[in-house]
Amino acid sequence: MAKSILFSEDARKKMQEGVDKLANTVKVTLGPKGRNVVLDKKFGSPLITNDGVTIAKEIELEEPYENMGAQLVKEVATKTNDVAGDGTTTATLLAQAIIREGLKNVTAGANPMLIRQGIKIAVDKAVEEIKKVSRTVNGKEDIARIAAISASDEEIGKLIADAMEKVGNEGVITVEESKTMGTELDVVEGMEFDRGYLSAYMVTDTEKMEAVLDDPYILITDKKISTIQDILPLLEKMVQQGKKLLIIAEDVEGEALTTLVVNKLRGTFTCVAVKAPGFGDRRKEMLQDIAILTDGKVISEELGRDLKEVSLEDLGRAESVKIDKENTTIVNGRGDKKSIQDRVSQIKAQIEETTSEFDKEKLQERLAKLSGGVAVIKVGAATETELKEKKMRIEDALAATKAGVEEGMGPGGGTAYVNAIPEVSKLTSDVADVKVGIDIITKALEEPVRQIAANAGVEGSVIIEKVKNSEPGVGYDVLTDKYVNMIDNGIVDPTKVTRSALQNAASVAATFLTTEAAVVDIPDKNNAAGLPGAPGMGGMDGMY
């Protein structure tokens, strides 16, 4: 395929136009008075959102050189979202500012490779300053602040703080769509897995159609149980003890299942059977998790253990187990605290090592089930359009909260960037173009405050000067139109988000400045040839 090539100034100018188109669309959403963007969808209703990365992902420009510029800045938003889960609008805005200032200097004759060095030095210093003013997130109030700022909604802040308080920092919090109009929090304490009873006759509460076993023994095996002879010795022990039994096995079928059901209906003993969760190697790991949580042992083919030889010491114990048609929840397993902690550390190490997003997600779920529990935020709204928008804001707020717990929080509203300017501007270099790179970052650090002010209809330059001349940590509160201590007034941003946005923006922007040629495909005008009814297909002109 033939290519079109543009060089130096022409290439950079065209690509910058693409950068501006994308960034100008995204940056209208920044700050508490930022607006939304409507995205057309091929199916269903349009999507209304203020999430930078969602908007950026939708943008494809017709002009190929402009599109290249837009795609480069899209990467800034995507990478920031992957690392921190929020701050994508800020990252896009910073990238645009660095590219704009950088290109002015490159056009004036500065060397882009040396500018790049200066940008790196300045960004490292700015990140150091951002980390200095960071403080750890302590308790529910701080978490609620971070979430409320991210979602621009105090109710959402409280909801996420409640969820994190209940399941802990390691717990999993998922966001789902609710069938009702209200938004509520549903917490599953203990370990839950998605397998229900094998027979409806096993229920103990016919009204709720669930089985509740108090202080049961738990048999954990990866074998298939087909004949009752396999577990008869164990069942006899259960009858003697007068205890209830939960069987977690690959499957319980045929005669074995029938016998368990008949004895339950006769009232001889209560036993509920469920299939083991997961598949393949993941199933083995999950069974081992359950064993550690309940202080039991996995009766496995691989270890040569026979079900007939199982003693009471091999069985797990728990305060209670609840089983419905689809899920099993083990509450307060009697496992040794140290063993559980060791297992948690092992899973954390695996999360660090794995590169697959899917594996990481599954390991995170296992970690949550062992260490905290699972909370589900059910989002409700009057219309589907509002529901989607609200769900996105909650997901962003959740990511911001986790980032805050990880690396702490600092003053919000772009104040952390402005506070870093004095130290960054002190940096010097004997090489003039390196100093140019430092100056570019010094100027770009003002941009978030400028845009937040602009979106609120206020002159950004005036605000920036006042923030610069105020005490560190004092910034502009858009909602009250006052200059306040940001952290004391609950206007906070996670340090990880602030840092990642700047680092990713600088990385892509500095590379952009070094562009000297751009190559794109020339669309093939003869693409239509060979289609039915197309020119050259003799005798087919009249086809419908």
From Swiss-Prot:
SUPFAM superfamilies per UniProt: GroEL apical domain-like (SSF52029), GroEL equatorial domain-like (SSF48592), GroEL-intermediate domain like (SSF54849)
Gene Ontology cellular component list: cytoplasm
EC number: 5.6.1.7
Localization (cell): Cytoplasm
UniProt GO MF annotations: ATP binding; ATP-dependent protein folding chaperone; isomerase activity; unfolded protein binding
Keywords of this entry: ATP-binding, Chaperone, Cytoplasm, Isomerase, Nucleotide-binding
Ligand binding (ATP): 29-32, 86-90, 413, 477-479, 493
Reaction(s) catalysed by this chain's protein: ATP + H2O + a folded polypeptide = ADP + phosphate + an unfolded polypeptide
One record GO biological process: protein refolding
Keyword ATP-binding: yes
Keyword Isomerase in annotation: yes
InterPro entries registered for this protein in UniProt: Cpn60/GroEL (IPR001844), Cpn60/GroEL/TCP-1 (IPR002423), GroEL-like_apical_dom_sf (IPR027409), GROEL-like_equatorial_sf (IPR027413), TCP-1-like_intermed_sf (IPR027410)
Enzyme class: isomerase
Domain of life: Bacteria
Annotated function: Together with its co-chaperonin GroES, plays an essential role in assisting protein folding. The GroEL-GroES system forms a nano-cage that allows encapsulation of the non-native substrate proteins and provides a physical environment optimized to promote and accelerate protein folding.
Assigned protein family: Belongs to the chaperonin (HSP60) family.
Subunit structure, as described in the record: Forms a cylinder of 14 subunits composed of two heptameric rings stacked back-to-back. Interacts with the co-chaperonin GroES.
HAMAP family: CH60
Protein name (Swiss-Prot/TrEMBL): Chaperonin GroEL
Organism: Clostridium kluyveri (strain ATCC 8527 / DSM 555 / NBRC 12016 / NCIMB 10680 / K1)
